A protein has these predicted regions:
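Proline/glycine-rich low-complexity loops and linkers
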Residues: 117, 177-200, 309-391, 399-401
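Conserved small/polar residues in nucleotide/adenosyl-binding loops
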Residues: 432-434
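Gly/Ser/Thr-enriched, mixed-charge loops and adjacent short helices
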Residues: 29-38, 150-277, 284-285
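An N-terminal, well-structured beta->alpha segment
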Residues: 4-102, 109, 191, 197-227, ...
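Conserved phosphate/anionic-ligand binding catalytic regions in large, soluble enzymes, centered on
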Residues: 34-54, 143, 231-239, 298, ...
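Active-site phosphate-binding/coordination module
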Residues: 124-182, 298, 309, 395
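Mobile "lid/hinge" segments at catalytic clefts and subdomain interfaces of large enzymes
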Residues: 397, 406-430
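N-terminal small/polar loop signature for handling phosphorylated ligands or for N-terminal nucleophile
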Residues: 78, 86-149, 245, 250-305
Length: 434
């Protein structure tokens, strides 16, 4: 700990005010902030924001990005540098700053870089990697963790999270980087004038949403159906409202949770797996006469819901939602290929196996983590198996239909859950009946 602390206190790279903050740390705080380095694992890194080697800050972001740059250049050469990296970020405090730091290190290494100008969801980042044909992508997010946290997730050229061999390769490179001496960085002005930094505004938004819309199962009547949706202060608000309004749904949003806010003032733990995050939604639903509440986590890759039945609000867990979605897709989709397959994690419900067997579908079980479902989709496309991807899910409220992204998509999830709820209401049923 002391070596790391002294290194930072004596470093010429730190600003005067940063050194003052470090100098004032208590012994306990020194240990917490400087005991080792924030771990960059096979899925990236996530931690409490603050100064120190064991905290999320611009210096540790630079270290991670230099390691990513080194790996990309070593393994992909000029081709990888020209294909480049796309960067997005969520609503969290410092996310936009961390995204810019990431971009400036990539550009300093001669890597073409696309930076989203404002916050976007994690699934749209996955889409952007594929649409722009980039070598990699970076998402600045800590998902549903408390407000003190932020994170850094790396995606590879197929739009999926890192798997082997890239995962271990990048981890090794990051671990070999000194956060001060080994990092290359240039100014934003230099990055733009060099032609390496490309700022993206809304160029991808409509195309992404069009792919989501294409995964709709039925064109149904929306008459008399009302929905309450909450982005929980996150990135889902704008795209989900636009998507559902375009499709003709009557959507109500709790005003206190409608707009991005990294302090998450109404829910300290913005996780749609927790019933209490629906409190404001339920209050609004009772006022407007809605019987379904749907919520995304802050980076909008996961989707939770509650349903009103006989006057009570009932929470549906990830396994229940996944089974309902799969059943709805199988019963109402036309022309499902005979070689269709389902992919899910080993910890998700065994009921999927029975549904697959009843419908003559192949099911593939993966290790825990949606990145392995994304890897399975790639293997289908490469011909490793004679199957095509139909649906993927994990019990932690993550779902995917289609192959336009390679990660769970909470915006798609919101659309499908809305559509499914509306369909069953139209035939006189609640999801609780199914």
């Amino acid at each position: 700990m002391q070596m790391n602390y002294t290194k930072w206190l004596d470093s010429s790279f730190l600003e005067k005010k940063e050194k003052e903050i470090i100098f004032e740390l208590s012994e306990k705080e020194k240990n917490e902030c400087f005991s080792g380095y924030l771990e960059f694992g096979t899925g990236g890194m996530r931690g409490i924001m603050g100064l120190g080697t064991n905290r999320m800050n611009k210096y540790i972001i630079r270290k991670a990005t230099q390691g990513l740059s080194n790996y990309l250049i070593k393994t992909c050469g000029e081709t990888g540098k020209n294909k480049g990296v796309v960067i997005s970020f969520d609503c969290r405090n410092n996310s936009s700053d961390f995204a810019l730091e990431t971009a400036l290190v990539l550009c300093a290494n001669g890597i073409k870089t696309y930076l989203l100008s404002s916050l976007r969801s994690t699934p749209e980042l996955s889409f952007a990697v594929r649409e722009l044909k980039c070598q990699a992508g970076v998402m600045i997010t800590a998902s549903h963790n408390p407000k003190e946290y932020n994170g850094y997730k790396v995606y590879w050229k197929d739009g999926g999270q890192l798997v082997e061999p890239e995962a271990s390769g990048i981890v090794s490179e990051v671990n070999n980087v000194d956060e001060f001496l080994d990092v290359k960085i240039i100014s934003k002005e230099e990055a733009i004038s060099s032609g390496l930094l490309n700022i993206l505004n809304d160029e991808l938004d409509e195309k992404y949403l069009s792919y989501v819309k294409n995964e709709s199962v039925l064109n149904i009547s929306k008459k008399d159906f009302k929905l309450v949706y909450s982005p929980l202060h996150g990135t889902g608000g704008r795209p989900v409202k636009k998507l559902l309004n375009d499709l003709g749904y009557s959507v109500f949003v709790p005003k206190a949770q409608e707009f991005p806010d990294g302090n998450f003032p109404t829910c300290s733990y913005a996780n749609p797996e927790e019933k209490n995050v629906f409190d404001l939604s339920i209050k609004l639903a009772d006022e407007v006469g809605a019987e379904v509440c749907i919520a995304n986590d802050p980076d909008a890759d996961r989707t939770g819901m509650m349903v009103k039945y006989k006057g009570e609000w009932i929470y549906l867990n990830g396994n229940q939602i996944g089974i309902l979605l799969l059943d709805y897709i199988l019963k109402n989709s036309k022309n499902i290929p005979k070689n269709s397959a389902i992919a899910s994690t080993i910890v998700s419900t065994p009921m999927l196996d029975f549904i697959a067997e009843d419908n003559n579908l192949k099911i593939f079980r993966t290790l825990t983590g949606f990145k392995y479902i994304g890897e399975k989709i790639r293997e289908f496309e490469e011909g490793k198996y004679n199957n095509s991807f139909l649906f993927g899910m994990e019990e932690s409220i993550g779902y995917l239909k289609g192959t336009y992204v390679r990660d769970k998509d909470g915006i798609l999830g919101a659309m499908l859950l809305t559509e499914m709820s509306c369909y069953y209401k139209g035939i006189g049923l609640s999801l609780i009946h199914i």
